Amino acid sequence: MKKIMIVDDDVTSVAIVKALLEPEFEVVSANTGVEALGELQRSPDLNLILLDMVMPGVSGMYLLKVLKKSENWSNISVIFLTSLEGVDIELEGFTNGASDFLQKPVNAELLRLKIKRQLFIQDLKAENQHLQKTLQTLHSRIDQVFNEVLP
């Protein structure tokens, strides 16, 4: 089962999104950026983060920058959940590595579709990496055989 973390200081929003996702996904939550970093330490198998942009202390944008600079967490997809509007906000988010945006209040069907799309993209990336490694191994083996046959 895929694992998703919701990071939002609004406890009601967390509860609503969690209820929408739990039948299909394992869901953990954090109410601050600092709590999110702690949860990341405990849950290295996270697949996706739903991240509020505006939180006290550590903002969602700052947390995104930390995640994308980390070797351990840079591949986790991040979808911003925000009440902020404007192209500048989205440009900053995408520039810093956000996977997508979703406007609050969240539409349940759109949320599920965006999550599934990001998880599908992750699966394709993982398959691509596996195929690249297999291809490199085969290429090395072919080189080895050629060197044995044609000294």
Give residue spans per PLM region.
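Acidic, metal-coordinating helix/loop segments flanking the phosphotransfer/catalytic sites
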Residues: S29-L48
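C-terminal output/effector regions of signal-responsive regulators
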Residues: A126, H130-P151
